[in-house]
Amino acid sequence: MIFMGKTSLGLDENIEGALCYLFGVITGILFYILEKESKFVKFHAVQSIILFGGLWVLSIILAFIPYGWMLSGLVNLAAFILWIVCMYKAYKGEKFKLPVIGDIAEQYSQ
């Protein structure tokens, strides 16, 4: 693990980056608003907001589609795997960019 320094909230950047994913959109928004200095944390906060917000919208859409419940199981499994991977990568100090979402998150974290 790489020591990354402290954030404006007093936590290590890697810890705060991982916490951005803990409760999905909620912690993403919380850290995006509260963190004033760390671009690393802001990146993970925005990526969390877009990822879990998008998955939430997708699950709502699937609820209205006949047999959408079958696909929702796969979406939930993918969401769980992405949740674990993103938290782990952030904790390790990596700026792990998801396809498409990562580029958008990078723009909004500057």
Swiss-Prot record:
Keywords: Cell membrane, Membrane, Transmembrane, Transmembrane helix. GO terms for cellular component: plasma membrane. Coiled coil: none annotated. InterPro entries: DUF4870. It comes from the Archaea. It is found in: Cell membrane. It is a multi-pass membrane protein. The chain crosses the membrane at residues 15-35, 49-69, 70-90. Belongs to the UPF0132 family. PANTHER family: UPF0132 DOMAIN PROTEIN (AFU_ORTHOLOGUE AFUA_3G10255). This is UPF0132 membrane protein MJ1443. The lineage of its organism: Archaea, Methanobacteriati, Methanobacteriota, Methanomada group, Methanococci.
